[in-house]
Amino acid sequence: MGRTTSEGIHGFVDDLEPKSSILDKVGDFITVNTKRHDGREDFNEQNDELNSQENHNSSENGNENENEQDSLALDDLDRAFELVEGMDMDWMMPSHAHHSPATTATIKPRLLYSPLIHTQSAVPVTISPNLVATATSTTSANKVTKNKSNSSPYLNKRRGKPGPDSATSLFELPDSVIPTPKPKPKPKQYPKVILPSNSTRRVSPVTAKTSSSAEGVVVASESPVIAPHGSSHSRSLSKRRSSGALVDDDKRESHKHAEQARRNRLAVALHELASLIPAEWKQQNVSAAPSKATTVEAACRYIRHLQQNVST
């Protein structure tokens, strides 16, 4: 496309040729992408019916691929619409004073194939006079749908999942307003050593205060925190005991008596068994120290010795 030096109608047309070619490419880009998107939607509807009869795993993979293709097509359309919005369209309007009816009549739409899209479904398109209105309306519709799908990034970050479905996300407070838990109260510091009120501790009154503060020693009768109690220790324990604790105590006492009786019987039997063994035979055949085990072993040997003597 060379530029001529002539003035008039042909010169004005030559000046408009670069801008019109750009607009043709943009229109071709938008129309082809729109047709691709519409054809893909029809194809998706047919695939949905077929995918309902297939396995669950294959249908999920197909849907993910289709969603990725749809998102790519929408991104291409958005970029094209932004390009159209950024262009100056005043030169297309017939409101210029130096334009004549012949000038507007000589500007004819030209058929172009878009070099930006490498598809076999690309068809020749023309520039419609309503291109600007269609581009702006479609751009606003796409922005609304994107806002619906993405929602607010702050609410999504606070909520943890996309979409404005949950109404509770609108009432979430920022981090600076979230109430913080109250700090736990510090435990009360008690003295390390507490002496009873009747203790005989000889300390001079001058060194009493310094020693008590340094060593942490407090007398029970002088402390406002630890007041002397009039009841005895055994009475307080008996009040705390329940019926189940009393039953456990009875079982423990009975078991203790039974064990003591068993040990007494064993001790009496061992003493009687040791008395039945003669002292002379015990000195000759038993060399270990006397114990319960040696007494039983010596008794077994003496019984075998008696059996041999009887058999002979």
From Swiss-Prot:
Subcellular location: Cytoplasm; Nucleus
Basic and acidic residues bias: start-end ranges: 248-259
GO MF annotation terms: DNA-binding transcription factor activity; protein dimerization activity; sequence-specific DNA binding
Source superkingdom: Eukaryota
Biological-process GO terms, alphabetical: cellular response to phosphate starvation; chromatin remodeling; negative regulation of transcription by RNA polymerase II; positive regulation of phosphate metabolic process; positive regulation of transcription by RNA polymerase II
Record key words, sorted: Activator, Cytoplasm, DNA-binding, Nucleus, Phosphoprotein, Transcription, Transcription regulation
Renumbered residue ranges of the record's region Involved in oligomerization: 203-227
Chief localisation class: cytoplasm
Motif 9aaTAD: chain residues: 75-83
Compositional bias segments (type: Low complexity): 49-62, 211-235
Statement: the UniProt record of this protein carries the keyword Thylakoid: no
Spans annotated as Disordered: 35-71, 138-259
Region ranges (Interaction with PHO80): 1-31, 156-200
Gene3D superfamilies according to UniProt: Helix-loop-helix DNA-binding domain (4.10.280.10)
Sequence segments annotated as region (Interaction with PHO2): 201-218
Polar residues bias: start-end ranges: 138-154, 196-210
Post-translational modification: Phosphorylated by the cyclin-CDK PHO80-PHO85 at five residues under high-phosphate conditions, preventing PHO4 from activating the structural PHO genes. Phosphorylation of Ser-114 and Ser-128 promotes nuclear export. Phosphorylation of Ser-152 decreases nuclear import. Phosphorylation of Ser-223 decreases the binding affinity for PHO2.
Ranges where the bHLH domain occurs: 250-306
A single Gene Ontology CC term: nucleus
Span list, region Transcription activation domain: 75-99
Subunit comment: Binds DNA as a homodimer. Interacts with transcription factor PHO2 and binds cooperatively to PHO5 UAS. Interacts with the cyclin-CDK PHO80-PHO85 and the CDK inhibitor (CKI) PHO81.
Reported function: Transcriptional activator that regulates the expression of repressible phosphatase under phosphate starvation conditions. Binds to the upstream activating sequence (UAS) of several phosphatase encoding PHO genes. Inhibited by the cyclin-CDK PHO80-PHO85 under high-phosphate conditions.
Protein name: Phosphate system positive regulatory protein PHO4
Organism in which the protein naturally occurs: Saccharomyces cerevisiae (strain ATCC 204508 / S288c) (Baker's yeast)
Recorded name of the encoding gene: PHO4
